[in-house]
C-alpha cells in the first residue's frame, strides 16, 4: 500500500508524469510519482510505502 504526499521539490503545474516520477524517486526518496489533479491544478504527487 502506498501513501501519497505532494512533492516538496516540484513547483507549478504538473504536465509530465515521467519527470515528476523521476524527481520524486531521485530527490525525495519516494517509490513512485505522477501528476494528479488536486484542485485547482495538476500537481506532482509522490508515493511512499506507508
Curated annotation (Swiss-Prot):
Disulfide-linked positions: 3-50, 14-35, 20-44, 24-46
Pfam family, one: Gamma-thionin
PTM info: Contains 4 disulfide bonds.
UniProt keyword list: Antibiotic, Antimicrobial, Disulfide bond, Fungicide, Plant defense, Secreted
Subcellular location: Secreted
Main localisation: secreted
Single GO BP term: killing of cells of another organism
UniProt-listed Gene3D superfamilies: Knottin, scorpion toxin-like (3.30.30.10)
One Gene Ontology term, aspect cellular component: extracellular region
Domain of life (superkingdom): Eukaryota
Listed SMART domains: Knot1
Function: Antimicrobial peptide active against fungi, Gram-positive and Gram-negative bacteria. Inhibits growth of hyphae in the fungi A.niger (IC(50)=3.5 ug/ml), B.sorokiniana (IC(50)=3.0 ug/ml), F.oxysporum (IC(50)=9.5 ug/ml), F.graminearum (IC(50)=6.9 ug/ml), F.culmorum (IC(50)=6.9 ug/ml) and B.cinerea (IC(50)=27.4 ug/ml). Has no effect on spore germination. Destroys spores in germinated conidia by disruption of cell walls and membranes in A.niger and B.sorokiniana. Causes vacuolization of germinated macro- and microconidia in F.oxysporum, F.graminearum and F.culmorum.
Similarity section: Belongs to the DEFL family.
Protein name: Defensin D1
Native organism: Nigella sativa
